[in-house]
């Protein structure tokens, strides 16, 4: 009985993993850190709070103008 429960739990976790992968989600205990330089083009996209538009690279960068 105990072995059946353990195997059942393992199979459920395995199915959930494949479901997440099929949905395009990564399974990782580590969170991704936002890059210091955002790839948003400044002319067509407003920079988030705490970022400014770098005129040279046309990208949002962390800091103040």
UniProtKB/Swiss-Prot annotation:
GO terms for molecular function: potassium channel regulator activity; toxin activity. The keyword Signal applies. Keywords: Disulfide bond, Ion channel impairing toxin, Potassium channel impairing toxin, Secreted, Signal, Toxin, Voltage-gated potassium channel impairing toxin. Residues 1-24 form the signal peptide. Disulfide bonds join 42-53, 47-60. Voltage-gated potassium channel inhibitor. This is Kappa-scoloptoxin(04)-Ssd1a. It comes from Scolopendra dehaani.
């Amino acid at each position: 009985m105990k072995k059946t429960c353990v195997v059942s739990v393992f199979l459920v976790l395995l199915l959930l993993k494949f479901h997440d992968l099929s949905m395009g989600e990564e399974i990782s205990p580590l969170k991704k850190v936002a890059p210091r330089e955002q790839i948003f083009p400044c002319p067509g996209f407003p920079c988030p709070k705490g970022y400014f538009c770098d005129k040279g690279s046309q990208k949002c960068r962390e800091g103040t103008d």
